[in-house]
Structures are given as C-alpha cells and as structure tokens.
Amino acid sequence: RRQRQMCIRDRLYKEEEIGVFFDIGTNGELVIGNREFLLCGAGAAGPALEGGVVRTGMRASAGAVDKVYLRNGVFQSHVIGAEKACGICGSGIIDLIAELFLHGWIDFRGKLDPGKSPLIQRRDGMYAVKYAPGLFFYQEDIDEFIRTKAAAYTMVEYMLRESGISMEEIARFYVAGAFGKHVSKESAIVIGLYPDMDRDCLINVGNSSLAGAVRLLLDRRVLDDIEGILEKMVYIQFSAVDDFLHMMVAAQAIPHTDIKRYPSVWERLAPNLRQLF
C-alpha cells in the first residue's frame, strides 16, 4: 500500500526517465522504475536510521541533536527546540558519523581511534565519543548503524542489478519519510547510505504516503491509475536473494569497501585516510 502511495505522490509510474523512490521509516521501502516497469521491495532499515537502537538515540523531537559539525576538535551541534541536548536523532547520527570519518576519528570500518581526541573515552568496556555535554555515542552504536546503512544501500544496489540499470541512468532519487526530509545529502553520501550522484537528483519529498493519499482524495481519476500500477509492480523478496548478505557485507564500510563508487568522498579524504583503502 505504501509503495503505491509513493508512486502516486511523485508520478513515478508515468515518467519516461527511470527513478528510484526510497521511503525510510520503520522499514525501508523501495521502488525503482518508470512508466514501463516498477520493481519494489522492503526491508528492515529504519530503526537505527531513526535513532531507535543507539544508547542516546531518540526521535526528531525537542531536545534531539539533529545536526553535528566538528570544528578544530570541538563538536558544534543544533538541538531541536533550542533546548538542552537530551539525545541524538537519525539526521544527527549521520552527520556525526560523517564528521568522525572525514576527520579521521574513525576508520573505514567505523572503529574509533582514542588517540585522535580526549573526547573519545573508554566507557562500559568500549570506546565512545562525547558529542554533547553528558552524551556519548558508543562503538556498538556505530557498528549497528553501519550494518543498517549497509542493508539500505544493498537494497538499492540489488534492485538496480536485477533490472540491469546503472546509477548513471537514474534521473531522480527520491527520499521519503521524516528521516529523508531532514538528513544532509552530503553526510548521507559520505557514510555510504546514498549513492554518490548528482546532488540535484537527490530529492527529499517528506511524507509521501500522506501526500499520495491527499492527491487521491482530490483527484478521483487517480483510482483509475492504481490498477495499472499494480500490474506493473514486481515484488522482490530480499530474504530470498542468495547473495544479498554477501553484497551487504561489502557495504559495511564507510562509505563502501569499493571506494571507487564514491569519487566525491575520495576527493575529500586527507592523504593519511586514503592510505587505509
């Protein structure tokens, strides 16, 4: 149902150019196609991306850190509601991990280097980085987040492979959901959640399900399109894909074990970080 609403919201099913529609919420729901075909699938990619499985994670509400910058060894952040930071939400996590990587505080595996800053401390048997007063982001949080972003990336990669489409053929990459609306495109590319592509082709569309439902209510002719959408849709069951886990393991690096897929990230890396690849 949600995937039909996604198609209705941005008329993917009527476009000549090929597009990708990725709704990141409790689950990751994906559609790739145009007016000729629609491949769709879903997988568990949402909880960590929304801050749900990290120790100090929270939804994007008052008190949540939603933007993070690392300047001269000091974290600067934006807190929703301009209140005291109580935790960190998905967009803040992506900024945090991207900044840690670009400044060499974590390596491509996401492992914290305690020699880089006194803000990286030993807590509860592992390293953690202090990103705000009294708030830490733990090594296990980073590891879980990398696994989750790898699953999301692999869903897109597999669908493109199955359809015989390259990233260069994608005209638009829509990201839906509250998470997609607020996340930094650059940070998401740095960590390997989004593919490295023209930023103008990455479009945040917000709550696509609600927008699709509103469009349906305002234009009953959309009902006539739904049967056509259903006829075009082919569902991919990721759990039944033999090499999905193998592909996901390859994506469990920042941004990816194959750094050639991320030329813009490579250009931003300091020489000592490039030596790690």
Give the positions of each predicted feature.
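Short, small-residue-biased leader/transition segments that mark boundaries at the very start
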Residues: 3-8
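Catalytic phosphate/nucleotide-handling subdomain of diverse soluble enzymes
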Residues: 34-36, 53, 165-229
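Glycine-rich phosphate-binding loop of actin/hexokinase-like ATP-binding domains
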Residues: 13-92, 184-206
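Phosphate/ATP-binding catalytic cores across multiple sugar-kinase/actin-like superfamilies
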Residues: 146-168
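Generic secondary-structure signature for well-ordered alpha-helical cores
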Residues: 12-15, 36, 70-73, 82, ...
